[in-house]
UniProtKB/Swiss-Prot annotation:
InterPro entries: Nucleotide-bd_a/b_plait_sf, Ribosomal_uL23-like, Ribosomal_uL23/eL15/eS24_sf, Ribosomal_uL23_CS. Keywords: Ribonucleoprotein, Ribosomal protein, RNA-binding, rRNA-binding. This is Large ribosomal subunit protein uL23. GO terms for biological process: translation. Part of the 50S ribosomal subunit. Contacts protein L29, and trigger factor when it is bound to the ribosome. The gene is rplW. The keyword Nucleotide-binding does not apply. GO terms for cellular component: ribonucleoprotein complex; ribosome.
Length: 98
């Protein structure tokens, strides 16, 4: 199973937070993904890049906050995250990188 270069465009970065760490105990991993990435694309990218079996993918979009910058109102970018549930016995060590 070789990774297609497009898979690297789908997965942006792992999310390392307290909540994401707690989810890892439930066999789930959280990634920041491209805003236009679909669930099947995310599933395929994770399976090819990390060589694991994915059970399901849940996505969420965090809307960017409005902030003041030099007296002007600005908008931060929206962030899309994917919570990937792995099959039993499968693990991903997100600290090692790709």
């Amino acid at each position: 199973m070789s990774a297609d270069p497009r898979h690297y465009d789908v997965i942006v970065a792992p999310v390392i937070t307290e909540k994401a760490t707690n989810l890892s105990e439930l066999n789930k991993v959280v990634f920041r993904v491209a805003p236009k990435a679909t669930k099947p694309q995310i599933k395929e990218a994770v399976e090819k890049l990390f060589e694991v079996k994915v059970k399901s993918v849940n996505t969420l979009v965090t809307k960017g906050k409005t902030k003041m910058f030099r007296g002007q109102r600005g908008q931060r970018s929206d962030v899309k995250k994917a919570i990937v549930t792995l099959e039993e016995g499968q693990t991903i060590d997100v600290t090692t990188g790709l």
